[in-house]
Design a protein with these regions (language model features):
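Conserved hydrophobic/aromatic beta-strand scaffold that supports enzyme active sites
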Residues: 35-39, 57, 75, 83-85, ...
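A generic "binding-loop/recognition-motif" signal
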Residues: 44, 53-54, 72, 90-91, ...
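Histidine-centered metal-chelating micro-motifs
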Residues: 45-47, 66, 74, 84, ...
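A short beta-strand-loop-beta hairpin characteristic of the jelly-roll/cupin
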Residues: 57-80
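Ligand-binding loop in jelly-roll beta-barrel domains
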Residues: 79-80, 88-114
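A short, N-terminal "cap"/entry segment at the start of jelly-roll beta-barrel domains
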Residues: 1-36, 47, 116-127
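Conserved short histidine dyad/triad with adjacent acidic residue
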Residues: 36-52, 88
């Protein structure tokens, strides 16, 4: 028999794998999958981190998400309706350059550690 379909309500999300500057909330975890929501306050910048062997897909619901990552000078920016792919082991940080909270839906594929906080990588990574 198959598993039942489940709905996780917004008020049922659980705090998950903290990184300074952002609030991750877990909706559910299944073998090879992590799904949740990420909120970054206006003007906030996260700490540097990566997602181990997990591939991450982000969907921007509201606000702006700016991502800096190891080995690249400058940043990429995503807006509502945009998708972002963060490859496994990619050291990065998010920021929100606007005056409104950004909201992102995350789906991660893999069974690694969800978030590994790390020290700032060597240059280049800033504009």
């Amino acid at each position: 028999m198959s598993e039942p379909i489940r709905v996780v309500r917004a008020d049922e999300l659980a705090p998950a794998d903290p990184t300074p500057g952002m609030a991750r909330m877990l909706a559910f975890r299944a073998p090879g999958l992590w799904a949740g929501r990420l909120e970054t306050e206006a003007g906030a910048t996260s700490g540097w981190h990566h997602h181990d062997v997990n591939e991450s897909s982000l969907y921007v619901v509201s606000g702006v998400v700016r991502l800096e990552f190891e080995g690249r000078e400058g940043y990429v920016e995503a807006h509502p309706g945009d998708f972002v792919h963060v490859p496994a082991h990619t050291v990065h940080r998010e920021s929100n350059p606007t005056d409104e909270t950004s909201v992102v839906v995350i789906a991660r594929a893999g069974d690694g550690i969800p978030t590994v906080n790390v020290d700032e990588p060597p240059f280049p990574h800033r504009s």
